[in-house]
């Protein structure tokens, strides 16, 4: 399975010099020029950061941007010592998952969809926002509305993708709120695995034990978990299918 999900202008290749202040990275281009790129992923990026690694960046012509370059991908080695490109722009995850929903690639799990809305307020105080709020088609036997929370996933151990890679209070809160929606609504956690070498998904207990416990509690309560895998290229992203839980 290697379906193209998103196409874009070819990215610029370079080499990582260093990442600093969490949201900045100095990158040496093939021309020899050194540029500073914005890093949307402010987490530890466990298992990814290595000075001298090959990277890919995009460029924006918007005059509103302080930095025209955005760090999009990094190249790492898998278990077989083969190159794997990993998508590290966390802002891209929702765009990818929306494409997957629109292409009906999740229908077998969540049913056929009538409408998709983004960033809809939910929870007891309505102060949280769900990534996607879906309504089912009238022909769908399950009439419950669907709440989808998306998590960008880059960390891997062997062939198991793991989330989170650090303690995430926000992620813990999301699991609690998803659990509270059950059974009146359908709660779905989608893991956007931005690398092709993952065969399974599991919660990152080592990084955040409480998140792992909350994940299993929510799963037992009826939360649906869908680990979606993608392969990243210089000018497009491909769908690699849904991976099982470990």
UniProtKB/Swiss-Prot annotation:
Q: Which Gene3D superfamilies match?
A: 2.40.50.580, 3.40.1350.60
InterPro entries noted in UniProt? SfsA, SfsA_C, SfsA_N
Q: Domain of life, per the record?
A: Bacteria
Xref: Pfam families: SfsA, SfsA_N
Give TM segment ranges: none
Q: Which GO terms describe its molecular function?
A: DNA binding
- Protein family membership: Belongs to the SfsA family.
NCBIfam families given in the database record = sfsA (TIGR00230)
- What is this protein called in UniProt? Sugar fermentation stimulation protein homolog
Which classification does the entry list for the species? Answer: Bacteria, Bacillati, Cyanobacteriota, Cyanophyceae, Synechococcales
Q: Which gene encodes it?
A: sfsA
């Amino acid at each position: 399975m290697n379906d193209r999900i998103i196409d874009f202008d070819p990215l610029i290749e370079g080499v990582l010099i260093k990442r600093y202040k969490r949201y900045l990275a100095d990158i040496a281009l093939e021309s020899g020029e050194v540029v500073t790129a914005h890093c949307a992923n402010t987490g530890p990026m466990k298992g990814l950061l290595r000075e001298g690694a090959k990277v890919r960046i995009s460029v924006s012509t918007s005059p509103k941007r302080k930095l025209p370059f955005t760090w999009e991908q990094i190249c790492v080695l898998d278990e077989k010592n083969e190159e794997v490109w990993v998508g590290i722009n966390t802002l891209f995850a929702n765009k990818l998952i929306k494409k997957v929903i629109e292409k009906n690639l999740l229908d077998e799990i969540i049913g056929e969809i009538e409408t998709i809305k983004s960033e809809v307020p939910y929870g007891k105080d309505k102060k949280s926002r769900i990534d996607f709020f879906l309504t089912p088609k009238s022909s769908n036997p399950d009439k419950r509305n669907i709440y989808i929370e998306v998590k960008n996933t880059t960390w891997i151990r062997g062939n198991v993708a793991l989330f989170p890679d650090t303690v995430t209070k926000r992620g813990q809160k999301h699991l609690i709120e998803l659990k509270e929606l059950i059974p009146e609504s359908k709660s779905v956690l989608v893991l956007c695995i931005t690398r092709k070498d993952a065969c399974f998904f599991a919660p990152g207990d080592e990084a955040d034990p409480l998140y792992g416990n909350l994940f299993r509690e929510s799963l037992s309560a009826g939360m649906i978990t869908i680990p979606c895998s993608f392969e990243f290229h210089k000018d497009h992203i491909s769908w690699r299918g849904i991976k099982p839980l470990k």
